[in-house]
Every structure is written in structure tokens, then in C-alpha cells.
């Protein structure tokens, strides 16, 4: 089912200007949430994990206390930007490297690009793939 959902989403939103509505169900961490994607004029709803495109936030199961603290704040901040139960929009949907998850530009209720907000507020870093930079400072 997940393969079909991702294929459908990629086909439906091949134009960058088209937005797909999503109801936020659960914040997972600072750059990932579970959302109910509304398909077919609001008739069908499918749950999917969405990773905010172009941003990297610290990991909750991080390598040091500082990373874990920052990760918990990033999760809280994402929840403030896109509260559970609200309807937001996603654009530029792409397959994620992990099965069952998609990457997308995420826009809050005010139309702000959530990834850009997280980077601007220094809650996350710009990320375009590849090796992630560490969040822990080595002595």
C-alpha cells in the first residue's frame, strides 16, 4: 500500500505549484511528522510519515546530551509550527531513502516554509542529502 501511496503522491503533485493538504497527526522529531494525506477531493485519507525537505535537525537518540537537548527543542518547535490536528500543505513530494516515508516542502497554516523557518531560527541546518554534519562538539 505504501508503494502505491508514494507513487500516487508523486504523480499527483508533479507540478511544483500544486499543494497537497495534510492533517498533522503526530510530531516524531524536529523534521518528521505523521500526517493524513487527503486524496481524491477529501474522500480518501492515507497516513504517511513526512520528512521536512532541505533541513536537518538533531536526533532525539543523539550522540551527546547537547544533541538530545537540541533535538527535543526542535521537536517542540516543529509542533508549534504545525500543531497536531491542523491542516497544512506539502509540495515537491519526493521518495525518501527510507521506505514508507516521503520528503516534501512543508508549509504551516500561515503559508511559511517550515524548513526555512527552522533553519532561520537555527533549530535545524540546511541539508540537501549526503553525509550529515555532527551536532556534538568533540573536545
Regions found by a protein language model. Give the residues of each.
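Small beta-barrel nucleic-acid-binding modules, primarily SNase/OB-fold domains
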Residues: 15-139
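Sec-dependent N-terminal signal peptides
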Residues: 4-13
